[in-house]
């Protein structure tokens, strides 16, 4: 039986109503800044500055994004300007699919810590259930990700990873992991939006105490032009992006919208003190057609 860490105090800069609690006893903000495709150092700095100014306290990156060092440098520069320190920021990174396996996964995680200039991460995810260079149907994918998870468990137990989780896993992948792990995943990060509502996955994760975090909440930007979304936004006096993000948050799903525009970063933070009606939630859910704008992991053995 794993020893769960004690429930930790909420940092003073995190409003309780904007926070969820993971199965590790750690708090996690419901809103974070995604950084996919933010690589230029100045773009990273401007986006992070706008995020911190508008109350974001979670930053999501990954080894494959190629921006861990830029994010680490920007945070060291910016945090003191807002009276914040490392403990005020929930920092997530992810294992590259090329680094699956026990030894490679541990080395990759330590490399991410070095790049970010941190001695711990709040959350570290297996980015993809398959191994780069292996066909999706290769049964070796299963063994490699199990080996990676063992490495993450050790790093979690050593304190370098406060929580561990997975990204792009299906119910099948999660069932397999839960049958063999010592430390259960705290978070599942997946593509989730009205056209890909992930109802079965959400129900499964709720039953197992795994928090679901959405990426591509705007459908890579295309859903902001969807007539049904625009109608709800006009009715609410909100932007389509705010409606899409609120739709997830209102289900208890955290969101990590990405933008290089400080104005949009600010707009995306305005998710509180208003609600979509039950009818509006259902109108948006009716758009569900199983559409992936990003990657579909269902074919990975």
What is the predicted role of each segment?
Residues 17, 48, 68, 72-76, ...:
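Generic structural signal for well-ordered alpha-helices
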Residues 39-52, 101-116, 172-174, 196-197:
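Short, acidic/polar
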Residues 85-99, 123-129, 191-192:
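A short, structured active-site edge motif that brings together acidic residues
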Residues 105-126, 154-158:
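CE4/NodB-like, metal-dependent polysaccharide N-deacetylase domain
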């Amino acid at each position: 039986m794993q020893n769960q860490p004690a429930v930790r105090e909420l940092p003073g800069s995190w409003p309780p109503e904007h926070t969820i609690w993971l199965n590790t006893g750690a708090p996690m903000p419901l809103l974070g800044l995604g950084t996919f495709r933010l690589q230029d150092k100045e773009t990273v700095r401007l986006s992070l500055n706008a995020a911190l100014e508008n109350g974001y306290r979670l930053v999501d990156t990954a080894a494959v994004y190629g921006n861990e060092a830029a994010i680490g440098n920007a945070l060291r520069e910016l945090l003191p300007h807002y009276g914040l320190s490392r403990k005020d920021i929930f920092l997530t990174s992810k294992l590259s699919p090329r680094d699956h396996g026990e030894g490679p996964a541990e080395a990759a995680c330590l490399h991410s810590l070095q790049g970010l200039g941190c001695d711990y991460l709040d959350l570290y995810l297996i980015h993809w259930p398959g191994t780069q260079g292996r066909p999706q149907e290769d049964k070796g994918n299963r063994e490699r990700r199990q080996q990676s998870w063992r490495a993450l468990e050790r790093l979690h137990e050593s304190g370098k990873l406060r929580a561990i989780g997975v990204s792009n896993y299906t119910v099948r992948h999660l069932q397999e992991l839960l049958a063999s792990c010592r430390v259960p995943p705290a978070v599942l990060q997946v593509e989730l939006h009205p056209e890909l509502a992930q109802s079965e996955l959400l129900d499964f994760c709720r039953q197992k105490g795994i928090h679901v975090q959405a990426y591509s909440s705007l459908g890579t930007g295309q859903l902001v032009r969807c007539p049904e979304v625009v109608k709800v936004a006009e009715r609410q006096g909100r932007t389509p992006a705010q409606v899409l993000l609120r739709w997830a948050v209102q289900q208890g799903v955290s969101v990590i919208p990405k933008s290089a525009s400080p104005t949009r970063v600010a707009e995306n933070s305005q998710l509180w003190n208003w609600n979509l009606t039950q009818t509006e939630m259902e109108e948006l859910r009716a758009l569900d057609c199983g559409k992936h704008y990003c990657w579909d992991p269902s074919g990975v053995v």
